[in-house]
Amino acid sequence: MAARLEFEKPVIELQTKIAELKKFTQDSEMDLSAEIARLEERLSKLQDEIYKNLKPWDRVQIARLPDRPTTLDYIQYLFTDFFECHGDRTYGDDAAIVGGVAKYHGMPVTVIGHQRGKDTKENLVRNFGMPHPEGYRKALRLMKQADKFNRPIICFIDTKGAYPGKAAEERGQSEAIAKNLFEMAGLTVPVVCIVIGEGGSGGALALGVGNRMLMLENSTYSVISPEGAASILWKDSSLAKKAAESMKITAPDLLELGIIDDMIKEVKGGAHHDIKQQAGYIDGILKETLKSLLQLNAEELISQRYEKYKAIGKVSVEDQYIGVN
C-alpha cells in the first residue's frame, strides 16, 4: 500500500504493518490479537492527530485525488429516479457537466454538477472536468427548466476551471459564464451549491450563485490555483505550497471569512475512504438547508441571494463599511 500524499506516510506504514500481522495470524496458529488491537488504537490516534491538523496544501492535494467522489457518485447515494438531460440546444452536449431531474427524499429537484474522470480514459471523455461553453449553457437550460416547474436546484462544484482552449473561446466561454451568473441571481427557486473537490475560478462560479454555499472539509474554492498564484507572485510555480497558505482557499478559512455558509465534515482521511458515509454527511446538512429555504417565497429567495453576494468584498475601516460594488 503506497502513500500517495506525503503526510499520509506514517498512516500507511502503520496500516501495512497491521495488515501483515493479520495475514500472519491467519497463516499461523499464533494469537496476535492484543498486538493488533494496540496498533489499531495507535492508528486511530495517529489519524486523528494528522487529519485534524491538515495544512492548506494538504487539503489541496486531497481535493485533487483521482478517486475523490464525483457528482455522479453523490447522485447515486443522495437521489432517486435520476434522469440525465443532455445538450444545450445550441451547439451540443458537454460531458464535463452532468445534470438532470431527480427526487430528493421524494421531492422533485434539479441536480447539476461538474464531472471529471477517475482515470485517463474517462478524463478524456469528461475533458478533465473543465467545461466548454455548451456545458454551462446546458446547465442554464436545466436551471431555467427548474425555475419554470418550481424545482429546487442543487449544484455540485468540482472543476479546476472552465476550459481555456481556442474552440471554447470562439464559442463564447466568457459570455456563457457571465450569462449563468446573471441568470442564477434571478432564479425564483432555492439554489444550494456544494463544493465537493476543487472550485476553480469562473468555471466554478458559473454554478456557484446560490442561496447557500456549502463546502466539504477538504475541498478548495479560489480564483486561481496555488501554482498559478505562485507563478504570478513569485515567478515560480514550485512555491504553490506557500501560495496555498496565504490564499485562504480552504473551507475552514472561507467559513471564517463568510464566503461560504457551512462546512461539511469529511470521513477520517477524506471523502474517498467511504463515499456512502460521506454522502450521509452531505445529506444531513442539505436536507436542513433545503427545509429552511423552502420557507421563503420567490422574492425573498432573490433578495437573500442578492444580499449574500453584495456583502462579499466589504471591509471594515475605522468601524465603517466600504462596499466594493
From Swiss-Prot:
Classification via Pfam families: ACCA (PF03255)
This protein's pathway: Lipid metabolism; malonyl-CoA biosynthesis; malonyl-CoA from acetyl-CoA: step 1/1
Localization of this protein: Cytoplasm
Keywords (A to Z) from UniProt: ATP-binding, Cytoplasm, Fatty acid biosynthesis, Fatty acid metabolism, Lipid biosynthesis, Lipid metabolism, Nucleotide-binding, Transferase
MF terms (GO), sorted A to Z: acetyl-CoA carboxylase activity; ATP binding; carboxyl- or carbamoyltransferase activity
Annotated GO CC locations: acetyl-CoA carboxylase complex
Group of enzyme by EC: transferase
Entries under SUPFAM superfamilies matching the protein: ClpP/crotonase
Biological role: Component of the acetyl coenzyme A carboxylase (ACC) complex. First, biotin carboxylase catalyzes the carboxylation of biotin on its carrier protein (BCCP) and then the CO(2) group is transferred by the carboxyltransferase to acetyl-CoA to form malonyl-CoA.
Family note: Belongs to the AccA family.
Record protein name field: Acetyl-coenzyme A carboxylase carboxyl transferase subunit alpha
Organism of this sequence: Bacillus velezensis (strain DSM 23117 / BGSC 10A6 / LMG 26770 / FZB42)
Gene that this sequence comes from: accA
